[in-house]
Amino acid sequence: YCYYDPFQQQKVLAPEYGGDGKKVDRCSGFEKPIYAFPAHWGPNALLFYTGNHFPENYRNGAFIAFHGSWNRAPLEQGGYNVVFVPMKDGLPSGNYEIFADGFAGSVKTPRGAQHRPCGLAMGPDGSLYISDDKGGGIWKITYTGK
């Protein structure tokens, strides 16, 4: 099993299959992904934003809801956020930014997370809705200016 390491910018052989997190081995012939995020974040929803409620730099970009990790031990769990990726001509055109965060609360373990983003929708007014399958809530994010 090969995975892409965005920090090394290469595919590496997974430890369970004889790798050490650095060994390329039989992974060298695989294509690199168009875009990569940290391991185990768990993307659950993708929304291409076509509204005009948010500032212009968000138009035609992609929002991604990350459900959060469950198996990064001994590292701190990650994800539990919504990111934005700028797009141009159907491809990512810049670095992602954390758009909404803090869902896990102070406890960042899978069972201890207060909320886990799992769905995205755009409202008729262009606002962004985020659903949560841990706490059962829905957030509405609106832009009111600086």
Q: What do these predicted ranges mean?
A:
Residues 1-111, 115, 141-146:
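Beta-propeller domain segments
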Residues 122, 132-133:
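Conserved beta-strand->loop/alpha-helix structural units within folded catalytic cores of enzymes
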Residues 134-136, 145:
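A short, acidic, flexible beta-alpha connecting loop/helix-capping segment that sits on the rim
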Residues 118, 124-126:
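Structured DNA-binding interfaces in DNA transaction proteins
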Residues 62-64, 127-130:
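Hydrophobic beta-strand segments that make up the repeating blades of beta-propeller
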